[in-house]
């Protein structure tokens, strides 16, 4: 099964040389298309119509918002296990975590059979704004409880010494 590759990206000035030497030669292939930079309104349609998002990050990406955006559209993610990828992608549920180009090619065939509703459900279970807000509030409450616990104990001791 031949699968096309559509590249959507902004090419910053610092990346032009890399783009010209590494990416442009690939654009001669009939299955490779460079879309360029896309806006927020185009992104939802682009990701929603994609078979998968290929996220070949090779550095410790702290989060990778585009993975979440793809999952919100029900689009599985194929990504290397760097940075936040293992925390964001539920391997076999919302995508595949791979460690090579060959594994990514195999994963592209596998994710074609993934239930996009389950990908979306994984997003809703873990990454909606409401879910993340609830998790943040719980974390803040835990931190506040830990921070104030020694203070309360110290205050009780001082009060007991005065009386």
Q: What kind of feature is each model-predicted range?
A:
Residues 7-9, 20-45, 52:
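Nucleotide-activated donor-binding/catalytic signature segment of Leloir-type glycosyltransferases, i.e.
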Residues 48-62, 75:
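Acidic donor-binding loop of glycosyltransferase active sites
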Residues 64-67, 85:
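Short glycine/serine-rich donor-binding loops of glycosyltransferases
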Residues 72, 76-79, 89:
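Short hydrophobic beta-strand element within catalytic cores of glycosyltransferases
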Residues 107-122, 142-150:
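Conserved donor-nucleotide binding/catalytic region of nucleotide-linked donor-dependent transferases
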Residues 113-129, 135, 154:
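A short, well-ordered alpha-helix in the C-terminal region of glycosyltransferases
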Residues 129-163:
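C-terminal alpha-helical cap of glycosyltransferases
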